[in-house]
Regions:
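Extracellular beta-strand scaffolds
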Residues: 38-39, 53, 93-94, 107-108, ...
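A short, surface-exposed interaction/processing loop segment used at functional sites
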Residues: 63, 115-118, 165, 221-222
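Short, small-residue-biased leader/transition segments that mark boundaries at the very start
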Residues: 2-10
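Thr-biased low-complexity repeat/linker tracts and other Thr-enriched repetitive architectures
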Residues: 12-61, 67, 71-85, 169, ...
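Intrinsically disordered, low-complexity regulatory segments
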Residues: 42, 96-97, 123-128, 138, ...
């Protein structure tokens, strides 16, 4: 049943009229809709009932399956679509389908994506849409995760990730988004690609994950001696011990310097130090 005069009643009445065996000589009429929110399956049925153009100018929201929505946008018999919000309310959408829908309307596309691997999801072409995404990869490049984070307004479920790889700064960016636009991070192992790194960035990363950080690619660490010793003392960072070190201190306790000297077999550049204190 429907409320007489309501949009649902008008819409249903159009298709009912076409289906009626008691009404003849319909089939080539132009149709002007009054709906604002419309199930796309109903629109496609109406499009099939008449060879005339269906004017969907009043529609502000289309709902339904991704395939049905794409069918409506591809139809030459439906006019004035292109700025409505789209909700994939039946089933999921593939990355390819999401791109097709996003290109078809300037409105926000809301959908749960069926793809979970970063290599496929990297193919998303637009931003500002409400895609629900669950990453299925266990090892993920942090820069790729951050790029994906910028393509959806819905928090990305990253709970399947067990290893993050890449530059420490990119990993810290991902962790900074955790709890807001990314969820499920906090205990991943990390494999760094940096060769030269500010130790403050490394220590921040160490605080962001309870997983082990593989820093074996690092050949030079830069920063304050105390911060460097903190990194070397951490049980959460592996692969350090032979890095060159460039200090940023100007005044330094010699005991701290000697501890640092014992932490790495690499050369310590103390060129910034103007004052040494201690016995």
């Amino acid at each position: 049943s429907c409320l007489v005069g309501s949009e649902m009643c008008i819409r249903d009445s159009l298709n009912t009229a076409y289906d009626s065996s008691g009404i003849s000589n319909l089939g080539n009429e132009a149709v002007t809709l009054s709906d604002t929110t419309l199930a796309v399956s109903v629109l496609n049925t109406l499009d099939g009932n008449t060879s005339g153009t269906v004017n969907a100018n009043t529609v502000t929201t289309l709902t339904g399956s991704a395939s049905d929505l794409i069918t409506a946008y591809a139809s030459g018999g439906i006019s004035n679509l292109g700025n409505e919000a789209v909700s994939v309310s039946s089933g999921n959408a593939s990355t390819s389908q999401a791109n097709t829908l996003a290109a078809a309307t300037s409105g926000v596309v809301t959908a749960t994506l069926s793809d979970g691997d970063l290599s496929t999801l990297a193919g998303l072409t637009e931003t500002g849409n409400a895609y629900s995404i669950t990453i299925t990869d266990t090892s993920v490049d942090a820069a790729a995760l951050n790029t994906l984070d910028g393509k959806t307004t819905v928090a990305i479920n990253a709970s399947n990730i067990t290893t993050l790889t890449g530059a420490a700064a990119d990993l810290n960016t991902a962790y900074a988004a955790n709890g807001s636009s990314i969820t499920g991070l906090g205990n991943e192992a990390a494999t760094l690609s940096d060769t030269t790194l500010a130790v403050s960035v490394l220590n921040t990363l160490d605080g962001n994950t309870s997983g082990a950080i593989d820093a074996s690619n690092i050949t030079t660490l830069i920063g304050a001696a105390a911060d460097l010793n903190t990194a070397y003392a951490s049980g959460g960072i592996t692969g350090l011990a032979n890095e060159a070190v460039t200090l940023s201190d100007t005044t330094l306790a010699v005991s701290v310097l000697n501890t640092l000297d014992g932490n790495t077999s690499g050369t310590i550049d103390a060129g910034t130090v103007t004052t040494l204190t201690g016995s």
